[in-house]
């Protein structure tokens, strides 16, 4: 397995990650999420990869499914790629920059598709990731209520939370079923 790191001095060379020293959200988290989503997908194209699966973990990756399905729609590199999102309870209170939806729409994504992130909360980001994924994994024992309700309402394949030591074989089976186009859930 090859591992690549997506980096940008302006966004990621800070001494903080998501929160500043006063436990407030870093003001450019929205732009960092956009940069990361585009950076990952552009790197895949630049290296001429055609991944079978892109598995996104956590809220910072929440825009990857949207960008892959909309901005890169019709791109041969992603033609057969399945997007899986793992949703966790580790997030944030409050909102990201209120203009996130405008910045995403500026990238050519239909404004109708970004209505849910006009108020860019943790739950809204999880919801947009789930809506644009081919399958979703619950990565935490408990999710925030709004995220859990959105997860429960999904029509695409899902995998319920499993203890990490039990999930490896189940995840392989889940990947195989997604690649084969089966529409089934895996219960934990």
Give names to the regions the model predicted.
Residues 1-188:
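Catalytic cores of nucleotide-sugar-dependent glycosyltransferases that transfer UDP/GDP/TDP-activated
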């Amino acid at each position: 397995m090859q591992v690549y790191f997506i980096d940008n001095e302006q966004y990621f060379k800070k001494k903080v990650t998501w929160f500043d020293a006063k436990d407030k959200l870093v003001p450019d988290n929205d732009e960092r999420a956009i940069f990361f989503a585009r950076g990952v997908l552009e790197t895949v194209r630049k290296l001429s990869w055609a991944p079978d699966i892109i598995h996104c973990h956590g809220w910072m990756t929440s825009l990857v499914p949207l960008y892959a399905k909309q901005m890169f729609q019709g791109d041969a590199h992603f033609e057969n790629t399945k997007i899986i999102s793992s949703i966790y309870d580790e997030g944030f209170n409050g909102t990201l920059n209120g203009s996130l939806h405008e910045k995403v729409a500026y990238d050519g994504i239909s404004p109708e598709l970004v209505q849910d992130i006009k108020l860019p909360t943790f739950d809204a980001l999880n919801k947009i990731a789930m809506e644009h994924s081919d399958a979703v994994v619950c990565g935490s024992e408990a999710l925030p209520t709004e995220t859990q309700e959105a997860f429960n309402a999904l029509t695409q394949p899902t995998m319920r939370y499993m203890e990490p030591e039990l999930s490896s074989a189940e995840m392989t089976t889940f990947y195989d079923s997604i690649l084969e186009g089966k529409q089934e859930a895996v219960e934990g």
